[in-house]
């Protein structure tokens, strides 16, 4: 959704490899070891892949809410000073993209 694919490609190659494999694992119905449920969405269908490289934290957020596809909602380098919590602007973007994905699925567009 949105700029997620472009954002993913801008990350370090090792991070892209981890996220790519984690998304492949999600497509098989399983969960990668670096994946956890992202809280605040009411169920376990929005997940976050967490990767750290050279002191930097990276996140890929996706949903398995739809039968037709695993939808990547947001990919970013975490720069929050508030500990492990995902920053509010990122959470707002994830929520907006999830809403848009839900609308597209209801319209019959995967």
Language-model features, listed with the residues they occupy:
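Basic, Lys/Arg-enriched alpha-helical interface segments
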Residues: 1-57, 66-69, 78-110
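Hydrophobic/aromatic beta-strand elements that line small-molecule binding cavities or substrate pockets
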Residues: 60-62
